[in-house]
Each structure stands twice: as structure tokens, then as C-alpha cells.
């Protein structure tokens, strides 16, 4: 504090740059400094005058920046003090609460909801699902959060985001509450495959998830990511390795998944025209090793009786 007084004595303006000193003190949780600056009359509601980079808000302008950043970093004492002094907890569409949910600050979320923030906030719900904050999600649901939004066609639904991040506990919780995974039009199994959580894939399929939705996305993603055992599993569950005009092997070619390409060639039923198309596809990416293997495979087809 002596250093701040020193600079003030030398003519420093603690309110300059739109209350930047206060914003930084709040962001880093320095409550004593925050109180001192507020007592000096620094504006606690100051809006950023230009587009700022907060990645979760896509660079949009926000007000009550000090409160929002304190909430993001979990500084409950700073948040509660700023609210007491007149900061708006609901500013920028409950943005402080959303960030507190994203970063797992349960007590901050609870405080902000109790002070007027809307628990039924899609982005807070989705961020909880992505970041595996089950207790915060349960709290938001207890306060009226809707986990059944009209987004069955949308990869941005709560259940889809939980699957995409491999959050098994969150998925089980949502299913336990009645979220229907059998008629979700986005491919939840594909989401789980992308997260490499194969146990979650098995769970979803066992509970009725359709592996063929979204134009056979599950087997296509498994192929392009090189997950041979997962491709085998999906085939046992009724998937067709030749779906979408052999798109699975084409994606494997595009990603240079040589072992996957060899596996699909070994189990599939290809004619010379099919392989000629695959050769053209590989040539487009200038994958000489794959092109040569496909040419050999095509020659073997020609020599078959």
C-alpha cells in the first residue's frame, strides 16, 4: 500500500486507463488493494472502452470487468465485496457466473446465483459438462437449469459436449436425469470417439445411442483417427465399412493412417473401380507409400481368378 501511496504522491492517477489498477487487483484477488482503491473513488463498474480479449467471450466488450475477472479466478471475497459496493453480478449476461462455472469455482457460482444470476444459462451448463464440474452442474440444475434444451440436432447440446470431452460421470448424470440419447440426431458415439474415451462409447451404445446418425460419423471418425479396435467394434454393432462411398478409408488415407488403410482393405469388398478411386484420392495428397500399396492391391485384384 505504501508503494501505491508513493505513486499517488508523485501524481499517479489510480483511475487512469478505465480503472485498470482496480481491475488488475480484482483479477489477482488482492482484496485489501481493491478496498483501498474503491475508498479512493475508483469506478468499480468501468467498462472496457475497446474490444478486449477474453477468449471465452470472443472479444466482446464487457462492463463490470473487475467483478467478472475476480469471478473467473475464484476470488469470492473480492466478488462479494464488489457486489456489496454496487457492482452488477448480472452484467454482460451473467458473464461472471458463466466463467466461474467454467473454471470450477462452486462457491462463486452459488454466490452469484443467490445474487440474481440466472442458473438456467446454456453456456454455463455446457462449460460444466466440458470441464467436468459435476457438483456445479448439479447445483445449477437444482436452481432450475434446463438440461433438455431444444438442441437434439446440435453438437453444442450439453450431452454432446460431455461426450466430446469424454466426461463419463457427467454423461451418466444427464442420462440418469432423463436426457434421451437414443434419438439425439448428432452422433454421440462419434463425440466420445473423438475424446478417446472408448468406455464411454460402449456405455452410450449399451444405452441405445445410434452409431449411424449424422451420416455414419462414428465409424468415419474412428477410421480417420486410426482406432482399429473401435472400427472392429462398430462393425460388430452393425456399421458398414463401405458407407458413404468408402468414405471411412478415404478419411484414413487423408490422415495417413497406414495400418487402418491396410485393415479396411483386408476386411472390405473392393473392386478395381473402387481401388482406382482410392488411388486418385491418395495421389491428391501425394502419399506415395499409400499409392504404391493401393496399386499393388489393385494388381492382386486383377490377378484373382
UniProtKB/Swiss-Prot annotation:
Keywords: ANK repeat, Repeat
InterPro entries from the UniProt entry: Ankyrin_rpt, Ankyrin_rpt-contain_sf
SUPFAM superfamilies xrefs: Ankyrin repeat (SSF48403)
Domain of life: Viruses
Spans through the membrane: none
Positions annotated as ANK repeat: 1-16, 17-46, 62-91, 93-121, 123-149, 154-183, 184-213, 215-243, 245-274
Name by which UniProt lists this protein: Putative ankyrin repeat protein R777
Amino acid at each position: 500500500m505504501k508503494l501505491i501511496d508513493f505513486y499517488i504522491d508523485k501524481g499517479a492517477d489510480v483511475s487512469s486507463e478505465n480503472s485498470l489498477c482496480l481491475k488488475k487487483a480484482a483479477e489477482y484477488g488482492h482484496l485489501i488493494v481493491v478496498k483501498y482503491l474503491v475508498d479512493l473513488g475508483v469506478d468499480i463498474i468501468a467498462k472496457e472502452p475497446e474490444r478486449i480479449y477474453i477468449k471465452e467471450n470472443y472479444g466482446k466488450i464487457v462492463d463490470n470487468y473487475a467483478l467478472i475477472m475476480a469471478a473467473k479466478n475464484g476470488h469470492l471475497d473480492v466478488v462479494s465485496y464488489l457486489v456489496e459496493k454496487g457492482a452488477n453480478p448480472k452484467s454482460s449476461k451473467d458473464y461472471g457466473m458463466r466463467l466461474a462455472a467454467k473454471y470450477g469455482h462452486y462457491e462463486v457460482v452459488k454466490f452469484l446465483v443467490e445474487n440474481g444470476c440466472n442458473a438456467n444459462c446454456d453456456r454455463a451448463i455446457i462449460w460444466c459438462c466440458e470441464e467436468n464440474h459435476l457438483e456445479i452442474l448439479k447445483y445449477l440444475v437444482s436452481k432450475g437449469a434446463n438440461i433438455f434444451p431444444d438442441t437434439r440436432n446440435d453438437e453444442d447440446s450439453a450431452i454432446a459436449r460431455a461426450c466430446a470431452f469424454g466426461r463419463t460421470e457427467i454423461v451418466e448424470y444427464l442420462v440418469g436425469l432423463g436426457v434421451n440419447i437414443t434419438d439425439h440426431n448428432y452422433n454421440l458415439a462419434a463425440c466420445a470417439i473423438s475424446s478417446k474415451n472408448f468406455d464411454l462409447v460402449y456405455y452410450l451404445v449399451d444405452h441405445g445411442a445410434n452409431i449411424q446418425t449424422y451420416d455414419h460419423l462414428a465409424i468415419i471418425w474412428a477410421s480417420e483417427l486410426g482406432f482399429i479396435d473401435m472400427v472392429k467394434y462398430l462393425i460388430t454393432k452393425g456399421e458398414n465399412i463401405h458407407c458413404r462411398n468408402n468414405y471411412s478409408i478415404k478419411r484414413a488415407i487423408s490422415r495417413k493412417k497406414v495400418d487402418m488403410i491396410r485393415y479396411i482393405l483386408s476386411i472390405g469388398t473392393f473392386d478395381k473401380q473402387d481401388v482406382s478411386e482410392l488411388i486418385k484420392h491418395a495421389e491428391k495428397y501425394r502419399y506415395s507409400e499409400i499409392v504404391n500399396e493401393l496399386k499393388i492391391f489393385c494388381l492382386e485384384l486383377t490377378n484373382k481368378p
